[in-house]
């Protein structure tokens, strides 16, 4: 991941970081037959990503949201979004069904409201 981030973000200036978002989606979790990552695994990878971003950009890296994608659905969204290093969700197939997407959004909003209060 570190190498991918360093190569992918080479040339990005610190003053442009407010427009940069990173989404992590394990290849084995993509698609209809994808296996969702556990919340613990996703959290560990997000910590690694944030560490790499800090190595590249220093304290300015805190401006970069890191999202998780990869078979996100209403059944696992809440366990992912409560993780401290996951800043948001990158939703694919679950957004195809309006009811599922609505449930997912409501669950995420509930978690964010609990963080703020």
Regions found by a protein language model. Name each.
Residues 28, 34, 71, 85-104:
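Glycine-rich phosphate-binding active-site loops on the catalytic face of alpha/beta enzymes
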